[in-house]
Regions:
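Sec-dependent N-terminal signal peptides
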Residues: 4-13
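Terminal presequence/propeptide segments associated with secretion/organelle targeting
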Residues: 2, 16-718
């Protein structure tokens, strides 16, 4: 055992030097990264990874739903992504009678595949560096406020101009996205094709796809079969189209080949996907601000809400299904905030940031260039001035906006205008519109008792963190009319407000009045929260007035410093297609503890706890384990489940394909480890890992567990 541990530690020491920080632009791969990737083990030409003039692996990687990544794994448009990426769709199709969240879902033929309105899959057709063109337009166009260089609206107009000038073909399904990179020092145009007829094909039960749930989230070792399957449909000509029974599976230009060989410690891997956001160019003051505002509020406010929700979800299956997606979404970044703050402290990231910024400032002094010092001083001043406003803004957003469904009550503005006009036709139209919106609202909140509990907890949590003199003005009413009792105020909202219950709403619609609207508790609460949002937004806007310009200078300095050292550069993540590469690698999270890079089905059985919903194991999976009926997916009598790689991932990489050195699919990225959550701000190769579902476990569940061998038949397995 001692020899094994020493061997692993030696491997860590020798292999960790290959950890490669960077969410690389595909357009820069050939010039910046080819040599390093080949040294690590890439066996295919870089043009097979990304080719601006032909098909490549890039063409099988899709943006799934706008927030995740997916990969096309068959010639007929079959898309593989994570279970948690498809979770909203699975919930959408679930009810107490057909509980696909609990039982899973498998379409045994094409007719059984379930249309999923609102879900899209997007292909990236072309990526163009348009920096020179954008800079030319910026010089020509009026810009009195100096904000065009980062304005999405302005850049959208420039994208249309460029497409017209270059005769780029635009169809109804084409989307142009022009984004600023490096704080506005470079610009890239992404030409996309969006498909909107997406159908659910398969998903394991949550006891597989969400095994470990909140306890294991952001942790390693993992034993989660976090995958789901969808299919892209198009019209008979292969063009994007809205749902129609006449649509057919898309015949794609490129799909991925799958390897059953698996990966071993030290093997080269690379990942493509759409990482959402990170902040590698922050100064130390900004990191500290993030810890004390955004992360602090996420941890404490979401934790309080989730406790209330979970208590009710465990009591009633209908409540569980309704709140499942909301709870999962909330819990995801609740735990992320906890892990990030702990990691930033443990790894002394603030000290590292201070050393980096001092290096750049010294470089500027040596060159007689004070622009970096001015930018640095400006950013520090801004952070100091906006701190209180940001803290309050985060409290409002977390506790009173995101957490409370009754913040989404319909607007009464149109009815108020009509009532003031005393025009009967206008009043009639406004009533009909409000009736429709009200019915939709009540359908979205079928469990008012749960909403009431959450509201009480959230208002108390908000009040706990915000001093009385700074709170939104609804607290003046709570203090004067309800003697400071938040419980009494919330009860009054649900018992007496127009939108408190359907009975009150129906009564109001029959006989609306300005008086009732003007003194309605829920309406007043919404106005008060909106006022708080506006005030904090104004304060933030005033404080941030010069931030973007200073940040652009600071980022340019960091770019130049890296390039002078011969180091490749990459921009912060912004939901655009990137590539990251590294190795399958175990790690040492603490003294005397070594985590292997692989997990197996044995670990699922070891974690089983039938009394804990997070660790329930399906009976059939236990039977397959007992009989070791793994088929061609097992190895040496074991069933691989997950593995880790030291690639540079973040949110948005969920569902990303993990490739081996030959460009074959070997896994699907789904999470990061707790020790590596600092990665959004500072990459630490010794501790940062991405957790991936082994493709062999995915296929084993589809084939052996679900009996959906027809899905296996359409894959290209090597």
């Amino acid at each position: 055992m001692r020899k094994q541990i020493l061997f692993v530690l030696f491997s860590l020491a020798t292999l960790s030097i290959h950890a490669d920080e960077g969410m690389w632009m595909l357009t820069d791969l050939k010039a910046q990264n080819t040599v390093a990737m080949r040294e690590l083990g890439l066996e295919i030409p870089i043009e097979e990874v990304y080719n601006a003039n032909g098909l490549s692996l890039k063409d099988a990687v899709v943006h799934f739903g706008g927030g995740c990544t997916g990969e096309v794994i068959s010639s007929e448009g079959l898309v593989l992504t994570n279970h948690h990426c498809g979770y909203g769709a699975i919930q959408q199709h679930s009810n107490v009678e057909h509980d696909y969240l609990t039982d899973g879902f498998w379409a045994m033929n094409r007719d059984a595949e379930l249309p999923t309105p609102g879900l899209t899959v997007t292909f990236i057709d072309r990526i163009l560096d348009v920096t020179d063109y954008v800079n030319e337009q910026l010089k020509k166009d009026p810009d009195p406020d100096g904000v065009n260089y980062l304005s999405p609206n302005y850049l959208g107009n420039v994208a249309e101009r460029f497409a017209k000038a270059e005769n780029i073909e635009i169809t109804p399904a084409t989307k142009l996205e022009l984004k600023a990179f490096y704080g506005g020092n470079k610009y890239y145009l992404f030409i996309k094709t969006v498909y909107s007829d997406i159908r659910m094909v398969g998903a394991p039960p949550s006891s597989i796809g969400k095994f470990g749930a909140d306890t294991d989230n952001w942790m390693w070792p993992r034993h989660t079969g976090d995958f789901s399957l969808f299919r892209i449909y198009a019209d008979k000509n292969g063009k994007p189209a809205e749902y129609s029974k006449d649509n057919v599976p898309l015949q794609v230009k490129k799909h991925l080949k799958i390897s059953l060989a698996g990966v071993q410690e030290g093997d080269f891997t690379f990942v493509m996907g759409f990482p959402g956001r990170n902040w590698r160019y922050m100064i130390a003051d900004e990191v500290e601000e993030r810890m004390q505002t955004t992360n602090f509020m996420r941890q404490h406010v979401r934790g309080a809400r989730q406790k209330v929700l979970m208590e009710q979800m465990l009591k009633d299956p209908a409540v569980r299904i309704h709140y499942a997606s909301k709870y999962a979404s909330s819990a995801n970044y609740w735990k992320n905030a906890i892990g990030m703050n702990e990691g930033l402290i443990r790894l002394n990231v603030l000290d590292t940031k201070r050393a980096q910024q001092e290096e750049l400032l010294a470089r500027g002094r040596e060159k007689g260039d004070d622009s970096y010092q001015k930018a640095f001083d400006e950013i520090r001043s801004i952070v100091s001035h906006r701190r209180d406003a940001l803290y309050h803004q985060q409290a409002i957003n977390e506790a009173l906006v995101t957490a409370l469904d009754f913040m989404r009550i319909p607007s009464t503005t149109e009815l108020v205008t009509a009532l003031k006009s005393k025009d009967k036709e206008l009043i009639k139209e406004a009533k009909l519109k409000l009736k429709k919106e009200g019915d939709k609202y009540f359908a979205s909140v079928p469990f008012p008792d749960v909403e009431r509990m959450v509201a009480k907890e959230m208002l108390k949590t908000y009040a706990n963190y915000i001093p009385a003199e700074q709170r939104i003005n609804i607290f003046e009413i709570i203090n004067s009319r309800f003697k400071g009792s938040i419980d009494a105020f919330v009860d009054a909202c649900f018992e007496h407000s127009i939108f408190g219950n359907p009975k009150n709403f129906e009564k109001f619609i029959k006989k609306p009045s300005l008086y009732k609207i003007g003194y309605d508790w829920m309406v007043l609460f919404k106005y008060s929260v909106t006022d708080g949002i506006l005030k904090t937004a104004i304060a933030m806007k005033e404080a941030n007035q010069n931030y973007d310009a200073a940040h652009k200078v600071w980022v340019k300095g960091m770019m130049d410093m890296r390039q002078e050292k011969g180091m490749p550069i990459y921009p912060d993540a912004n939901s655009t297609l990137r590539l990251t590469y590294g190795q399958v690698l175990s790690y040492e999270p603490a003294d005397g503890v070594v985590y292997d890079a692989h997990t197996t089905l044995k670990g699922v059985m070891e974690k089983e706890d039938q009394g804990n919903w997070e660790f329930v194991v399906p009976q059939k999976l236990k039977e397959l384990y007992k009989s070791q009926d793994y088929g061609r997916y097992g190895k040496n009598g074991e069933m691989p489940v997950c593995f880790i790689v030291n690639t540079d991932n973040t949110g948005g990489n969920s569902g990303s394909p993990v490739f081996n050195s030959k460009g074959q699919l070997v896994g699907t990225a789904f999470d990061r480890n707790f020790e590596g959550l600092t990665g959004d701000i500072a990459f630490r190769p010794s501790s940062q890992r991405a957790a991936c579902v082994d493709i062999r476990y995915t296929l084993f569940i589809i084939d052996k567990y679900a009996g959906a061998s027809h899905i296996i038949d359409e894959l290209s397995i090597e």
